[in-house]
Regions:
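N-terminal, positively charged/glycine-rich alpha-helical extensions of SAM-dependent methyltransferases
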Residues: 1-18
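Conserved alpha-helix/loop element of class I SAM-dependent methyltransferases that forms part
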Residues: 24-43, 58
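Class I SAM-dependent methyltransferase SAM/SAH-binding core
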Residues: 44-107
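A short acidic, Gly/Pro-enriched loop at the edge of an enzyme's catalytic core
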Residues: 105-118
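A short SAM/SAH-binding and catalytic strip from SAM-dependent methyltransferases
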Residues: 116-130, 153
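Conserved catalytic/acceptor-binding region of the Class I
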Residues: 131-132, 146-213
Length: 274
């Protein structure tokens, strides 16, 4: 894999999305994740990859004034949106930090802290080594505390995983790592077990709440005017090759009309520290 700074790449991707991020399925899904966590008044919560504060604010309401929520995200743009929400809602039980969620031991604000619940919503697939991350996160749980984390179904959001395959074939970085979860819920369960967590339950939930047909041509344009996530593949010297490889990978998935019906499914794990 070509050298690049994965946390920086992710920061760039989400800085560009910050102002429009909430105009999507993300608010509904974040609320659902917090509901699954079953937070109680007085609990302490760590919200990793907190983004614009969607789950953070829901968690703040759930734990009430005697609880606390710490949000961590690499994207300054996303955190700016979250901070604006905190000011608008006058919340005093939340603190936010700009930092990589893969290196929490270097975040001084977390020194000595333990949490009743750790949330990571829609972000595990952004990590190059998610297993190592979950192992580290588990050390921040109180005894009996739980982690709530999700990965999308291998047949969901197929354009993204196709770009990832093209990136591997071109030896160029694409800042997501869904190929780590080819077995879906099985890989997620194993990751939690390897982190020493127990009482693991895996739920299958809807993400966008509708089936979706996707068309090849809708995504080839991402290489003509590349987003931050596809910028390496959209460079002029590689763009046409990347398009051909995308078409090749797409053909392995598509029907005779060149379309794919995606599976609207996310696997959510709830796993406890003994």
């Amino acid at each position: 894999m070509a050298l690049h700074d994965q946390p920086l790449d992710i920061g760039d991707v989400y800085n560009s999305r910050a102002e429009s991020y909430d105009n999507s399925w993300h608010p509904r899904f974040a609320r659902h994740m917090v509901e699954i966590a079953k937070l109680k008044p007085g609990e302490d919560v760590l919200d990793l990859a907190c983004g614009t504060g969607l789950a953070t604010l829901c968690a703040s309401t759930a734990v009430q004034e005697h609880g606390s929520v710490v949000g961590v995200d690499i994207s300054g743009g996303m955190l700016a949106q979250a901070k604006h929400k905190l000011q608008s809602h006058d919340l005093n039980n939340v603190e936010l930090h700009q930092h990589s969620i893969t290196d929490l031991d270097r975040l001084l604000a977390l020194n000595g802290k333990k949490f009743d619940a750790i949330l990571c919503c829609s972000a595990l697939v952004l990590l190059r080594d998610p297993g190592a991350a979950v192992k580290q996160w588990a050390t921040y749980l109180k005894p009996g505390g739980r982690i709530v984390v999700d990965v999308i179904h291998p047949r969901d959001q197929l354009p993204g995983i196709t770009f990832e395959k093209v990136g591997k074939r071109c030896n160029l970085p694409v800042p997501f790592y869904r190929l780590n979860f080819g077995a879906g819920s099985g890989d997620l369960r194993q990751m939690c077990e390897d982190a020493g967590l127990s009482r693991i339950s895996i739920l299958s939930v809807s993400q966008i709440d509708r089936p979706e047909l996707v068309d090849l041509n809708d995504f080839l344009t991402d290489l003509d005017a590349p987003r931050p996530s596809t910028r390496h593949l959209g460079r002029s010297q590689i763009r046409e090759e990347a398009k051909m490889l995308f078409k090749d990978e797409w053909a392995k998935l598509a029907d005779e009309q060149g379309k794919i019906k995606q599976v609207d499914c996310v696997f959510v794990a709830v796993a406890y520290r003994s």
